[in-house]
Amino acid sequence: MRIAQPVRRNHRAGISLIELVVVLGIIAALAAAAIPSIQDMLERRRLQGFARDLGNMFQIARSQAIRTGNNQIAYFGPLGNTDGPAGNVLVDSAGETVPMLILDDGPPATANCHIDFGESRETIPLPNEIGFGVSEATVKVPTDTGSAAFSPPQTSGTTASDPSNNPTNWVLFRPDGIPVGFDPTSTTCGTIGDTGTGGAGLYVTSGGRDYAVTLAPLGSVRVHTWSEAGWTQ
């Protein structure tokens, strides 16, 4: 007499179509929920990186002034800005407009505070979806000593000024590394300010987040971010 063997079920059978649809739906929902946070992270990193680049450019200008004994001028602001009365647009070596340019203007005795052909320059590009000004901040950084008025959205992106407190988009670093404001003519540096006139703030935004870079009157640089509690120090 034969004993009936138990039926063996195949536990390796594939999942059903309904189960597959459910799994894919869960994956899609998780991915959709993660996209905004990823985009926010990328936006923050891009803006933070640009703010740090601006701060680094100030530090480069200061160190170059001390090293070479030449005037170094930092020009900055929205694309299309110029070097003042001379009207030279801020561009890189390829002719592309840039948000910041460091110019080696030569020894103080011969410097003219304008961008001339052949002068050494350093530039940085403007990242996509980043601009000058603020979108959330309501006040300037407390340690921003720039004399130009601050009024959101501050489309100039700066509080830099000349010795008479008129808004500008430049700062001159003397050979001792001290930043000062100046009021150029069409051919010369015009009036160069004393120590204390070069403090300024730069403000950049992604449309939903704001960062600032402050240049102290003696040349130190700090990067700040805006939050509900105000600017970080």
Per-region residue spans from a language model:
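Glycine-centered recognition micro-motifs in short, flexible terminal segments and loops
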Residues: 5-28, 33
